[in-house]
């Protein structure tokens, strides 16, 4: 849903590094939504209870211990021949400030109108890419090598560089199961 909302902005502002600093109220809303979702998902990824009062310091320490290479992982946008590293530079010394998109989210959250220029295409793209990357890593942690990663819907925007997918979209998985059941019935006849 967040990816779809971001993609709808591309009807008006082309996804291009030349437009990285283009800001809008829609990007402010998206940055707030993605940031809130990312905050919640960090808790899930780290195994913290939803009611725990955790922050970026807690998330950063856990994630970098669990997946230190996250800072080098590239997110690709093949359709636009673009790539970026949303967690590049993330560190435990300044966890919130070392992620520009997170710092932007916090500043928009606390003073939207004074910081509207931070609500730009680049920060929204990086926040969305960071969420996608963390979700994919979480899926790979909970699925064994014999199980597919099964998100509700495959990303139409992102891919991960040097990532091994065990990916079957839900619709194809059910078709596969139906096909196997039909095949078994056919084999018995």
Regions found by a protein language model. Give the residues of each.
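Short, solvent-exposed segments of well-ordered alpha helices
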Residues: 21-32, 92-99, 118, 122
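Amphipathic alpha-helices that form helix-helix packing interfaces
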Residues: 2-9, 30, 37, 41-44, ...
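Short non-catalytic regulatory patches outside canonical folded cores
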Residues: 38-103, 110-114
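Polyanionic, low-complexity intrinsically disordered segments
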Residues: 139-189
């Amino acid at each position: 849903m967040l990816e779809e909302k971001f993609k709808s902005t591309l009807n008006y502002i082309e996804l291009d590094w030349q437009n990285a600093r283009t800001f809008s109220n829609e990007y402010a809303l998206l940055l707030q939504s993605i940031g809130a979702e990312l905050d919640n998902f960090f808790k899930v990824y780290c195994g913290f209870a939803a009611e725990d009062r955790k922050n970026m310091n807690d998330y950063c320490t856990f994630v970098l211990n669990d997946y230190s290479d996250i800072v080098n992982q590239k997110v690709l946008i093949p359709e636009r021949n673009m790539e970026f590293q949303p967690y590049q530079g993330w560190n435990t010394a300044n966890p919130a400030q070392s992620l520009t998109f997170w710092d932007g989210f916090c500043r928009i959250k606390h003073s939207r109108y004074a910081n509207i220029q931070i609500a730009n295409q680049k920060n929204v793209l990086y926040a969305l890419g960071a969420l996608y990357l963390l979700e994919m890593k979480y899926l790979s942690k909970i699925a064994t090598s014999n199980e597919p990663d099964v998100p509700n819907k495959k990303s139409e925007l992102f891919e991960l560089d040097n990532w091994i997918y065990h990916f079957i979209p839900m619709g194809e998985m059910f078709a596969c199961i139906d096909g196997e059941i039909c095949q078994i019935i056919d084999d018995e006849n």
